[in-house]
Amino acid sequence: IAFGSQALVKDLVTGFFVLLENVINVDDWVILGGHDGQVENLTLRHVAVRDIYGNLHTVPWSSVETITNQTRSFGYAVVEVGFAYRENVDEVISVVQQVAKEMRQEPELDEGILRDLQILGLIELGDSSVVVRTRFKTLPFMRWRLERDFRRRIKNRFDELGIEIPYPHQTIYFGENKQGTSSPARVLLEKRLDPEANPPGDESDS
């Protein structure tokens, strides 16, 4: 009973200050108690959060240590653009900026963008790609839509211009002997059978 009373008091005290300080509101998108979703209900004892799969999580305030409000005031749509080492970095950045400008020509998207695209720089020289990080400052709930739309447009534009987007692949290296030559590779080729032909051993049509 004492333990239950202690948890109840903690729920009420924490809930009181969360509501008093307006940390989160109904409809905000938050991360708390190990859950990521939209706030559907707030009480002094708990908060109800619905995730993207429709699951409703009821979280007592006593189990919440940190609250991350992802939709307070503004958001950042952050997109990392990867491309092959053979591509010119400045040219790729120019293409990305042009795509961003075209997005701002569409009123439905432009109204959600608070600041022009920022190029945050080259952040990674990976195993197979060069990565540039970009971001828009957006209205709170527009960040995810803009990220999706920006990625789609970049992919389509890269395809049009022949800019390579690398993907994981492996190069097989057979090694060399002391003479500097490699051992021959034995490759077994299988003949593709005509699907209309009879399987081996089937002489029904003969």
Spans of model-derived segments:
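Solvent-exposed, non-transmembrane regulatory segments of membrane-associated proteins
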Residues: 1-4, 87, 97, 106-206
